[in-house]
Amino acid sequence: LLYCAILAEELGDSETAALCRTEAAVLHQAIERVFGASIHGMETYRYHEGLDELRSWICMPLCMRIFDRADGTAAALTSSYLLRADGMLTSEANETMWDRSMLYAVRGLFAAGHMDEAFRVLRAYSENRLLGERVPYPVEAYPEGGKRHLSGESALYCKIFVEGMLGIEPLGFRRFSVTPHIPSALDHLTLSHIHAHGGVFSIDCRGGKCTVTDAGGAVLAVCSYGETAIVTL
């Protein structure tokens, strides 16, 4: 709904934009009212009313930048209830793992500012799944799916860096924001020659600062880790 509002504004439809923002606020409140819950002492979300077990899809509010219960949700996602050496369980009630929810969860953890926890999970996942003995693709539900490949989910891995670590979020056809959450284990992170928003730009993060430059090297924006910069191309 918020992205619909941005699109409507770009198209000059302020009435629809306002309606979408109002509906988004109502939905935000409903998510907290219906799904907000304390499970195992952690302030997070329940999958539905009456369910008192953790499920990995509690990560979705973080991916949608709803951080009301970010700390409790981060604790739940990285707890022994859900996280295993070989991946993330879909539910604490069974031993089925699915990389799709794992990749969403890591992206959400970065976006919520829990970058060091997220990076530990990301590094273990990358070494085990993508650089291990198997073909480098995310896998479907295991053991019930027999580790069938989910090749399309490779895009979710990329989104961890773009939307999670760098926090790139569209604000218009030629505008976007950058909110870097770089883990302490990385001394720098650079993405060069990004083609998006009608232009070409690069992002370099090091020494606690993130610098956005255009194709010619001119500085477009600078921000500290955890802060937000608005970029117009």
Walk through the language-model features, giving the residues of each:
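Active-site core of glycosidic bond-cleaving carbohydrate-active enzymes
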Residues: L2, I6, E10, A18, ...
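A residue-level signal for beta-strand positions that form part of recognition/binding surfaces
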Residues: I58, R175, V200
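Beta-rich accessory regions
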Residues: L7-E15, L19-T22, V26, I31-V34, ...
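A glycine-rich beta-turn/hairpin centered on an aromatic-Pro dipeptide
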Residues: E163, F173-S184
